[in-house]
Amino acid sequence: MTDQVFDKACRACPRLATFLDDVNQRYPDYYCKPVPPFGDAAASFLIVGLAPGMHGANRTGRPFTGDHAGLLLYQMLHKYGFSTHEESLAADDELRLTNCRITNAVKCLPPDNKPVGAEINTCNAFLGNELSTLAESSVVLALGGIAHRAIIKALSLRQADYKFGHAALHDLGRFRLLDSYHCSRYNTCLLYTSPSPRDGTK
């Protein structure tokens, strides 16, 4: 069992490690490694996504940076004072987060954006350690059902007691868990997400 919140050299999931190697061959300028959490280490607001996107975090090395989902997310973070900029384009830009931290349930890019159960479980110890650093009365935002379930698992809670639902708020004792549909292009195009529902989760 690891006590880390991140391991940049992790290759514990053979399928993901092989896939990253293949992607790196096709896109040699891409980051193509486990993507670390980003933001304020002492934040009381933690955002948990699913996994790095092919041409977003997997390219730039920073969560939700350089793709459609990031455009939507950082616009909201900037609007409510958590981000210095409303666009996150590259890991070396000047964007900084205040009292906010962003991570993923799975730290490596999965094929077709779909990690399998064993991969989610392998990465779950990192997420559990990250959750353990949160202060009392913090808020965790789960972007999507997989992120929600990974959080519940990391806390050793019963999934049946905490069902995922868009805009659902769960009291987990030490902090609260807020659910939202993931702000991916796919969900947005299907009208599952839009700026107004996300505004309602502030």
Predicted regions and their residues:
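Conserved small/polar residues in nucleotide/adenosyl-binding loops
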Residues: Y192-P197
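A polyanion-binding, active-site-adjacent surface
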Residues: M1-F164, G173-T188
